[in-house]
Design a protein with these regions (language model features):
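N-terminal loops that bind phosphate or other acidic moieties
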Residues: 1-132
Length: 132
């Protein structure tokens, strides 16, 4: 049995949005889940960066896999492009989930020891959580 937990990469067009969502999600895990913010371009502008996504995947993977949450459609394209050439793409799941709620739900599930499929499912199911 391993102590590895599923890692999470948050891919946003905004470095600040990714960092803020990562900070919020980290609060619910008590620091037990690796959450990487991969936001903005390499030169600090709005957009996405394949290099940041690839680094994020490597940093987040402790052996249990990585769930990636993108903020908008073109972030999905960036992640998919990275996964085409990524050495261990089978250990990565791209979640179709609300960005903030999905990040928190994924983190809670990863912290509880959920496997990669459970973590991705929790992120995706967060879309059904009612606020009012």
């Amino acid at each position: 049995m391993t102590d590895a937990t599923v890692g999470i990469v948050l891919v946003s067009h905004s470095a600040e949005l990714a960092a803020g969502a990562a900070h919020l999600a980290a609060q619910v895990s008590g620091g037990t889940v690796t959450i990487i913010a991969a936001g903005g371009t390499d030169d600090g502008d709005l957009g996405t960066s394949a290099a940041k996504v690839e680094r994020g995947l490597s940093e987040a993977d402790s052996g249990a896999g990585v769930v990636v949450l993108p903020d908008l459609g073109s972030a999905v394209l960036t992640v998919r492009a990275v996964l085409e050439d990524y050495g261990d793409a089978e250990s990565v799941l791209l979640a179709d989930a609300p960005f903030v709620e999905g990040a928190v739900a994924a983190t809670v599930t990863a912290a509880a020891g959920g496997d990669i499929k459970a973590v991705a499912a929790a992120a995706e199911e967060a879309r059904h959580a009612r606020k009012l």
